[in-house]
């Protein structure tokens, strides 16, 4: 049976699921298009919901989550669904939970804030440019098994809840961060950029970069073990590992 993945495009997401890089026999991918509605009826027949790099604006409502949508996503994951959320440079653009940003999903993801900017790694921890985070040290987890090198371009970092969330990838102690609101760079040190969590009967993975999923990018799926990492994520979210 192929993994059934539903990809949300109704909230101004910038990244689609890289189905062309994967076996058609293993993955069945459908989409909630920008004019469609994300609700439980759209989700219930799938194994995994993917939301990739929402670019929140200050005033538009279409890139925000309504209380009903939050309730339906919680129901989907709580009943055993998998949830993959990826962010990127700019994070949640400082849009508050009250306004309906991706922060509202914190009960599922364990992430309270996606910082508005991008990681700039120190020497030996980036590939070609500082914004391409090179990861060679990973915490032990089913998702990181067999992984020796990952590349996360244009990556943000998270503030986590104190609830059941596990950090499996962090930056180096010397990592910097470029804040988008003033373009200044400051040291942030070791901060989480990939976390996993459990929500009732379901599972969630949150990654601070989305460009590692791109199929036509030198630092995307073909870089390091990025493709195997995605495969491990899908298997873990589907309770295969």
Where are these regions (language model features)?
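A short, Lys/Arg-enriched amphipathic alpha-helix followed by its capping loop at the start of a domain
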Residues: 17-27
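An acidic, glycine-rich "communication" segment
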Residues: 90-183
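Short alpha-beta junction capping motif
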Residues: 44-99, 207
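Stable alpha-helical elements in mature extracytoplasmic
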Residues: 14, 18, 69-72, 98-102, ...
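Short, well-ordered alpha-helix to beta-strand connector turns
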Residues: 26, 45-47, 165
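Solvent-exposed loop/turn segments at secondary-structure junctions
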Residues: 11-13, 36, 50, 54-58, ...
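A short, well-structured beta->alpha microelement
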Residues: 26-42
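Extracellular ligand-binding/catalytic regions of CAZymes and related secreted enzymes
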Residues: 1-9, 13-15, 181-241
